[in-house]
């Protein structure tokens, strides 16, 4: 059987004229553009705000500033693609308003549509898929597909450790939002996918730092207790960023708050009496929202659960994955990390990895009593496929390894 061709190879081989829309904050799209040009490709870029310009300056040839309204972007993009014979559109994330319009235009004009995203297999990878990522992924969702592809997968060596943690990301974010905030007059009609207010972020980043220090010793002590096996059996609930597209678009809950309340209700009324529950706050959400008041309400209403429900912030998730008996998530990629540890996973949102053989297919109330494990053979095939096809070693906020052929 033929060896799987990595998506990065297909991206390079299948097109000549590329259009880059919004990339991740930072210099990655500039680096990607330069890499494509070494293969004599034509690369065009559209910037949407001054934060985009900060990392992909308009001085780079064939870079354009879109200063129109959102409802005019469809017409602008259709003409742009026709004028420049675009045969591939590349973006970061497929749920931003401009990118959703671009997907429709691409489909109508038979232009390939490529999406970068944070890694499915973290922390040392980023994702590249054709057609969409996460719930918009075009990949089949059944075990037989991945099992049938296993023989075609390349042998993948250990990745370089390129993820550098929070500080590089914070530095890049400050530069991006400072430029975007103070130069809004240039792009008066731009609609950001999140709040675009520098004062808002400064306040909440400071709050995040204070909370990190406040919870440090408490979380450290709790982590040691878990690592020593002193907490007993527990299920893990990793919360997601409150305004992430995975929450806003790829699930039916109104909010993370509503998701959490449903889990707490079910745990209290249906979980075995010996089971504990650990709710883990998302580290990127620390300064923005706090769910302590929700959890406290349930503990007050049901005093018997005060010592069975725990809310943590910065306990390293690998510690929790090594000891936990199950995970409940909306659709977080931490669910894939749990599967790597052979931890049963229930997804309550829409996730591309939610299918029989990998995740639990029953309901929430019955999951507390689940004794089954993910099928190791299925997960191994799933992981090998993505490493051979969709995952690229690197971090958007430090370095991404771009090479051709990729699997060498």
Predicted segments, located by residue:
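Leloir-type glycosyltransferase catalytic cores
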Residues: 140-184, 357-408
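Catalytic donor nucleotide-activated moiety binding site of glycosyltransferases and closely related
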Residues: 267-313
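A nucleotide-sugar donor-handling region in carbohydrate enzymes
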Residues: 146-245
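Structural motif
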Residues: 17, 87-88, 233-234, 276, ...
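Active-site donor-nucleotide binding/catalytic segment of nucleotide-sugar enzymes
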Residues: 21-25, 229-260, 265, 274, ...
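Active-site and donor-binding regions of nucleotide-sugar-utilizing enzymes
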Residues: 26-30, 48-146, 335
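N-terminal subdomain of nucleotide-sugar transferases
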Residues: 1-49
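A donor-sugar binding/catalytic signature common to diverse glycosyltransferases
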Residues: 88-100, 313-359
């Amino acid at each position: 059987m033929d060896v799987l061709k990595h998506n990065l190879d297909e991206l390079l081989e299948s097109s000549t004229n590329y259009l880059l829309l919004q990339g991740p904050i930072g210099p990655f799209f500039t680096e990607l553009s330069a890499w494509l040009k070494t293969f004599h490709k034509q690369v065009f870029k559209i910037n949407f705000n001054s934060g985009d310009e900060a990392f992909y300056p308009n001085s780079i040839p064939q870079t354009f500033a879109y200063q129109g309204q959102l409802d005019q972007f469809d017409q602008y993009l259709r003409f742009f693609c026709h004028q420049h014979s675009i045969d591939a559109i590349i973006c970061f994330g497929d749920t931003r308003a401009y990118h959703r319009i671009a997907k429709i235009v691409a489909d109508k004009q038979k232009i390939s549509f490529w999406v970068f995203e944070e890694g499915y297999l973290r922390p040392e990878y980023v994702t590249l898929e054709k057609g969409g990522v996460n719930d918009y992924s075009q990949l089949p969702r059944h075990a037989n597909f991945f099992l049938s592809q296993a023989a075609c997968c390349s042998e993948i060596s250990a990745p370089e450790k390129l993820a550098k943690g929070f500080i590089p990301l914070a530095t890049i974010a400050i530069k991006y939002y400072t430029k975007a905030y103070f130069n809004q007059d240039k792009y008066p009609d731009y609609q950001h996918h999140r709040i675009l207010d520098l004062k808002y972020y400064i306040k909440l980043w400071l709050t995040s730092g204070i909370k990190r220090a406040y919870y440090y010793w408490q979380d450290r002590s709790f982590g040691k207790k878990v690592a020593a096996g002193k907490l007993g059996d527990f299920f893990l609930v990793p919360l997601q960023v409150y305004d992430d597209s995975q929450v806003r678009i790829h699930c039916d809950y109104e909010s993370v708050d509503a998701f959490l309340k449903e889990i707490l209700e079910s745990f209290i009324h249906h979980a075995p009496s010996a089971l504990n529950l650990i709710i883990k706050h998302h580290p990127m959400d620390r300064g923005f929202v706090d769910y302590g008041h929700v959890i406290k309400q349930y503990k007050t209403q049901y005093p018997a659960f005060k010592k069975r429900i725990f809310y943590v912030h910065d306990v390293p998730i690998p510690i929790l994955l090594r000891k936990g008996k199950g995970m409940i998530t909306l659709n977080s990629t931490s669910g894939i990390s749990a599967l790597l540890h052979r931890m049963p996973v229930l997804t309550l949102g829409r996730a591309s990895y939610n299918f029989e053989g990998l995740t639990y297919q029953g309901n929430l109330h019955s999951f507390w009593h689940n004794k089954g494990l993910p099928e190791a053979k299925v997960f191994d095939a799933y992981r090998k496929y993505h490493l051979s096809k969709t995952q690229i070693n690197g971090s958007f906020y430090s370095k991404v390894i771009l090479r051709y052929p990729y699997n060498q």
